[in-house]
Amino acid sequence: MKFFIDTANLDQIREAHDLGVLDGVTTNPSLMAKEGIKGVENQRRHYVEICNIVQGDVSAEVIATDYEGMVREGKELAALNPHIVVKVPCIADGIKAIKHFSGQGIRTNCTLVFSTGQALLAAKAGATYVSPFVGRLDDICEDGVGLVADIVRMYRFYNYPTQVLAASIRSSKHIMECVEAGADVATCPLSAIKGLLNHPLTDAGLKKFLEDYKKVNE
């Protein structure tokens, strides 16, 4: 299991990196806007900054929704840094663009995936990653983790190399459910990653150890 952090916040990326478990970063236009990063050039400089911190895969999303625009933007993004993975929406022109990028050796992340059919087309087109959105499916009372498990089974059955990148993860519980479902990657907020450390018995045990140490060393 690889851990990606889903943010454009450099401080959070550095903190996750310093923890020693970070494998990559996913971003999107909403996360860029949240950080107040405006303008194409500023956003691209930001992607390079992220790549310099992480030294792992960084998903950078195209804004265009037409084939020619996605291909143009994707090539420009991929040229920024070898760690860039071009993030492409799961629409008809997006699948065409992924096929093109695959032929050019440009890695891709097919995003906004909500069904096994979409995941199948992404894999057939040669996507490096496919991103099923767990939390957003849960929001409409569908089984997001179940979709992750279904995609994993399908890819294994047909030996597709596309990696399942579980996205829209809201909690530490989501992470562990996706681990059990066989996801290759979980991209999540820093709070969910750090939440994996939390257990009351760990806190109680550490407190007891320290108290006992003080008793014999006073």
Curated annotation (Swiss-Prot):
Keywords: Cytoplasm, Pentose shunt, Schiff base, Transferase. It catalyses: D-sedoheptulose 7-phosphate + D-glyceraldehyde 3-phosphate = D-erythrose 4-phosphate + beta-D-fructose 6-phosphate. It comes from the Bacteria. Pathway: Carbohydrate degradation; pentose phosphate pathway; D-glyceraldehyde 3-phosphate and beta-D-fructose 6-phosphate from D-ribose 5-phosphate and D-xylulose 5-phosphate (non-oxidative stage): step 2/3. GO terms for molecular function: aldehyde-lyase activity; transaldolase activity. GO terms for cellular component: cytoplasm. Pfam families: TAL_FSA. GO terms for biological process: carbohydrate metabolic process; pentose-phosphate shunt. The lineage of its organism: Bacteria, Pseudomonadati, Bacteroidota, Bacteroidia, Bacteroidales. It is found in: Cytoplasm. Gene3D superfamilies: Aldolase class I. CDD domains: Transaldolase_FSA. Belongs to the transaldolase family. Type 3B subfamily. Transaldolase is important for the balance of metabolites in the pentose-phosphate pathway. InterPro entries: Aldolase_TIM, TAL/FSA, Transaldolase_3B, Transaldolase_3B/F6P_aldolase, Transaldolase_AS, TSA/FSA_arc/bac. It comes from Bacteroides fragilis (strain ATCC 25285 / DSM 2151 / CCUG 4856 / JCM 11019 / LMG 10263 / NCTC 9343 / Onslow / VPI 2553 / EN-2). This is Probable transaldolase. The active site is at 87 (schiff-base intermediate with substrate). Its EC number is 2.2.1.2.
